[in-house]
A protein has these predicted regions:
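An N-terminally biased module of ancient metal coordination in phosphate/nucleic-acid-related enzymes
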Residues: 1-87, 99, 161, 165-175, ...
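Short amphipathic alpha-helices and their capping/turn segments at secondary-structure boundaries
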Residues: 19-32, 90-104, 136-146, 173-176, ...
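Active-site gating loops and adjacent loop-to-helix segments of metal-dependent hydrolytic enzymes
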Residues: 39-57, 103, 108-125
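Hydrophobic alpha-helical segments and helix pairs
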Residues: 77-122
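Domain-core and long-helix interface of multi-subunit machines
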Residues: 108-210
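Mid-to-C-terminal alpha-helical segments outside catalytic/metal-binding sites
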Residues: 213, 229-255
Length: 255
């Protein structure tokens, strides 16, 4: 792989490893570009503290550490400072205000929740609720329409186990939108390696028929994920099997 834009750090409280170890693993495996995109902090008005993302107080250290690594390894690899974030409309203004003074190169949209996290409605849990599926697709499209996000992480995270006709209808709508906007779909290495419900063959068949492009995201939660050549090759084989041209460079990011 030439590039990976989906990399976490220990600050999200469910990843492990030093920041430098991720960089050195990427260099060892021949990456030319490494984008960090740890789970973005949210400002919870009720004082809730998320166990699965960095806290607002940790963002300074994240940016400081990665800025230093950018300089230290400039001759070996291009490093970007990004964030993975949900699009939750009622919380977005406060988040944008909080982030505006930080040198964030990009964000990717990872829609793990459709509502503020403390409500506990995770989109990866099995459901046959058609209204929730439509809400997921509507909200992802609305999020991408803001222009805040480089691409959509694990688009097939939503674990719909209901009517396959509805699944095809709604995810086709999403794939058509992404194609029109020239946004690649992510083939998620973590999901593949961990035998999760994604990458989902049903979703990939839809993407193939629509003519989407794809990007491979390591979704690294440990430096070793960047060295998992077998899983990376398996992801690449999926792009070939479903005839999804691979995207690895984004012109809007300067090197």
């Amino acid at each position: 792989m030439f590039a990976n834009y989906h990399t976490h750090t220990a600050r999200c409280h469910h990843a492990t490893g030093e920041d430098k170890a991720y960089v050195e693993a990427a260099i060892q495996n021949g990456f030319q570009v490494l984008g960090f995109s740890d789970h973005c902090p949210w400002i919870f008005s009720d004082g809730y503290v998320s166990p699965i993302r960095m806290t607002p107080d940790e963002l300074d250290g994240y940016v400081t550490s990665l800025t230093a690594l950018k300089k230290e390894y400039a001759a070996d690899i291009t490093i970007y400072i990004g964030l993975e974030s949900e699009y939750v409309p009622e919380m977005l203004p406060e988040q944008q205000k909080f982030l505006q003074d930080y040198p964030i190169d990009y964000q990717i949209l990872g829609e793990h929740f459709l509502y503020p996290e403390q409500r506990g409605i995770y989109t990866g849990r099995p459901t046959d609720n058609a209204a929730e599926l439509k809400h997921y697709v509507d909200q992802v499209i609305a999020g991408m329409e803001t222009g805040n996000y480089l691409y959509l992480a694990h688009p097939d995270l939503f674990h719909f186990i209901g009517d396959p006709v509805l699944y095809e209808q709604e995810f086709r709508r999403l794939c058509v939108y992404l194609k029109e906007k020239q946004i690649p779909i992510e083939i998620n290495q973590l999901g593949l390696a961990d035998h999760r419900q994604y990458p989902n063959p049903a979703f990939l068949k839809i993407a193939e028929s629509v003519g989407n492009t794809a990007i491979i995201g390591c979704d690294a939660h440990h430096p070793s994920a960047l060295l998992d050549i077998d899983s990376q090759q398996a992801c690449k084989k999926l792009t070939e099997q479903y005839h999804l041209p691979l995207v690895e460079v984004f012109p809007q990011l300067s090197r």
